[in-house]
Amino acid sequence: MKILVIGSGGREHAIIRKLKENPTIEEIICAPGNGGIAADAKCINVSAIDLANMVELAKNEKVDFCVVTPDDPLAMGMVDILEMEGIPCFGPNANAAIIESSKVFAKNLMKKYQIPTAGYAVFSDAQEAINYIRTENRYPTVLKADGLALGKGVLIAQTEEEAVQAVNELMVDQAFGQAGKQIVIEEFMTGPEVSVLAFTDGHVVVPMVSSMDHKRALDNDEGLNTGGMGTIAPSPFYTKEIADTCMKTIFLPTVEAMKQEGRPFKGCLYFGLMLTPEGPRVVEYNCRFGDPETQVVLPLLKTDLLTIMRAVHDEKLSELMIEWEDKACACVILASGGYPQKYHKGYEISGLDDYGQVEGVTIYHAGTAWKDGKYYTNGGRVLGVSAVSDTLEQALQLSYEKIKEIQFTDMHYCTDIGRKVVKQ
């Protein structure tokens, strides 16, 4: 059997390494992939958003099954096009991917179906948004670009001045292009934030192990928002009682709502949750595996991943019993200095073996290149150092211990991943 995984980051590397455990898979292709993924799959340099050439590649390679994970190709209809060519896929069609590609759609969906979330207002005019801010006068307040912005289109304003600046940045300067044509301004929620990825075939919802993402670039929750600087799983805040509440009030109602709207969702649905004093509420939806959440969730999966993905595609998820390791996992991201703003590429990475690994942990490659027998930095987030152990403390300790063996110029990482829940 031949599998195509579309994407080029640490998340795709984690999916590929998990798929490799299945002996019926003869070959895994990753497009475009990266230097480290090349040790585990055949990488072919076709952009994830080049729909025509990706379909051509899938047909030429006679691919049996395709996994589409990045948000852009999902929103553009990659799954629709591949399936029209008779290639079964894991991932939602464009009609359902709107749950992530439009924050306005997601907020309106939650309002209509009474799914708990923050109070909000939608604006397509900058001056109206500024007038609203001045009238409401509530801080902190959250401003979100409607469209996809690489996980960076959310701004938290502490003052009126910052809020007005955020509106101008999103709507006038168009920092994220068309993504900021409309914006959502919403109330600031408090409480621990938890990520729950879930498999769904449009009928049944099977949540994965919970995780906690650390989004800020610097220690002590400071610095700019990033795609994620580290993760732990499971979240100690996410109790069985909270999980049951989420299933009843959020997970099932969301999947049911999408069905009612004529947008049945099949794939991995990511729930970004805030455990507020009033109960769990939705911060955001993603229509795909999170990054770097995937790098801590999939290492704990016992059931074969391809079997699950095919059951999702065939709408037979109810027939599966999905099992997880009773362990903990931590992943610390090693980033290029300057990320998420300007950074240099092309620095040699030392400390990795020929397969891009370090003994005792799993290294997931996000932004790396392989050239003349050496690994080089090639992105903002470069590597994820992921460790599995019996406790979170041990997993974090192991990750940080092994980071000492890896070096590249201007290497940056947060030293306090998991500190909120673990006394290190």
What are these regions (language model features)?
Residues E21, G36-A38, N60, F90, ...:
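Solvent-exposed alpha-helices and their adjacent loops that cap or buttress functional pockets
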Residues A38-A41, V55-E56, I98-V104, L218-N220, ...:
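Short, charged, surface-exposed secondary-structure boundary motifs
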Residues V154-T294:
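Internal nucleotide-binding/catalytic subdomain
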Residues M247-L269, N286-V358, K371:
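Active-site "cap" helix and flanking loop/linker of ATP-utilizing ligase/carboxylase catalytic domains
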